[in-house]
């Protein structure tokens, strides 16, 4: 499988102007720096739901807040593009495991059940987000640093469903 994987990957730059079509048998991954311009920060704050705003304010001011805000900004914009709507029309709810899902029916069932997941990490001197999108099947992504001394077996048992 590893021999064919590289031939199936179609990496596109962040500057790519449009979202490619997402077919049922595809997985789209987006790796984005979690930083925003002042104008984007203002827009992102307006897009936050009450739950998201509370989570944003509970983070320490600075990098943690900026990364959270940028993550939600990019997530809402990507979801809007995949569902052919606007970022302010995307409504998220959260599962008991705190995983977000599309909660407004007109968006969540459009285009055959869009599924997504997001994680963030420190990469070199900047925080980055990894966003995953697919159709008709659940998806999950996570990034762990090799430098961290974690019990990955315990993490997997606790987090993987």
Description of each model-found segment:
Residues 1-161:
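Core catalytic alpha/beta fold that binds nucleotide/phospho-ligands
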């Amino acid at each position: 499988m590893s021999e064919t994987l590289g031939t199936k990957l179609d990496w596109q730059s962040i500057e790519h102007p449009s979202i490619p079509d997402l077919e049922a048998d595809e997985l789209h991954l987006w790796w984005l720096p979690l930083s925003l311009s002042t104008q984007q920060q203002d827009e992102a704050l307006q897009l936050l739901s009450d739950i998201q705003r509370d989570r944003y304010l509970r983070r320490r001011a600075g990098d943690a807040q900026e990364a959270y805000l940028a993550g939600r900004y990019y997530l809402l914009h990507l979801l809007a593009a995949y569902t052919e709507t606007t970022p302010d029309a995307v409504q998220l709810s959260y599962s008991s495991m705190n995983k977000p899902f599309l909660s407004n029916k007109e968006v969540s069932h459009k285009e055959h059940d869009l599924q997504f997941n997001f994680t963030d990490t420190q990469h070199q001197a900047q925080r980055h987000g990894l966003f995953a999108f697919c159709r008709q099947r659940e998806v999950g992504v996570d990034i762990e640093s090799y430098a961290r001394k974690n019990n990955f077996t315990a993490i997997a048992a606790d987090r993987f469903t």
